[in-house]
């Protein structure tokens, strides 16, 4: 049995999710203690419980400590099983964080896994559904990962009610080295518009979606226009789709991406739409100007997949505590050792 100190490093829910996912992959029983010990409300929260319940169901695990506020968790997996699963997280619990708890295990199923999940698609402190679809899953495809998500209905805090369907196929993972594209880092010797015909649109265009539910149509339009204006000032083209809907919950947000760098922001009462768009755009510009292969959020998500795939690497502008913690957890389960070195003002993370 592997024992994990849940207060190590970043000490949050991600540590538990990664530990459970790798327990499912390796078949190792785990005991996680001191869960979220240093947080204002320690122990497991409601949204953690749904993710852990789902993981237990998919791999037939014996579990104890699955209650709100619990500081210890025992998880003993049996076999990862495919099939169809319907999950209702309740209110606005994050759909993407639930998926984060099970996705590393799904390449090893015997048959495909089909999920229908209700909860929050665009909520604070978690990747948005658009980021998962257009950045995370696109990056995982480079390892041979076979998964897709389809947005049915957006769910915002506090009511949630969003709906997503997801399909994951058995697959064999292989290593991949993420390299920055020349369009990521702009210098005087590489101004916008120079190079091969068509290169500007291919290398420089940022894609995005600005959305709102039960709000005036000008809200997502203003978010998009604010982001687009900032990108133009910075020398980037941007194509941002705008959608206005009437879903169960009320809210707005914007997600922007280029390659393996993304950024997002959520609207809230009293926050002008222009500030929402600007916040997301600033995040993307910061990542692109750093010239790294992946953004700081994708970096920590890639860690367990790199270890499972072998012989992989990326560069990132900053090694966050989330990423360092994920490396530590992953090394507890798998016979791998990550290497980290500073290179040209960036951090290069490699394994295998």
Curated annotation (Swiss-Prot):
GO CC terms: cytoplasm
Active-site residue list: 322 (tele-amp-histidine intermediate)
Role description: Catalyzes the conversion of 3'-phosphate to a 2',3'-cyclic phosphodiester at the end of RNA. The mechanism of action of the enzyme occurs in 3 steps: (A) adenylation of the enzyme by ATP; (B) transfer of adenylate to an RNA-N3'P to produce RNA-N3'PP5'A; (C) and attack of the adjacent 2'-hydroxyl on the 3'-phosphorus in the diester linkage to produce the cyclic end product. The biological role of this enzyme is unknown but it is likely to function in some aspects of cellular RNA processing.
Keyword NADP found: no
Gene: rtcA
EC number: 6.5.1.4
HAMAP family: RTC
Protein name (database record): RNA 3'-terminal phosphate cyclase
Sequence positions that bind ATP: 100, 297-301
InterPro entries to which the protein is assigned, alphabetical: RNA3'-term_phos_cycl_insert, RNA3'_phos_cyclase_dom, RNA3'_phos_cyclase_dom_sf, RNA3'_term_phos_cyc, RNA3'_term_phos_cyc_type_1, RNA3'_term_phos_cycl-like_CS, RNA3'P_cycl/enolpyr_Trfase_a/b, RPTC_insert
Record organism: Methanosarcina mazei (strain ATCC BAA-159 / DSM 3647 / Goe1 / Go1 / JCM 11833 / OCM 88) (Methanosarcina frisia)
Native organism taxonomy: Archaea, Methanobacteriati, Methanobacteriota, Stenosarchaea group, Methanomicrobia
Cross-referenced PROSITE patterns: RTC
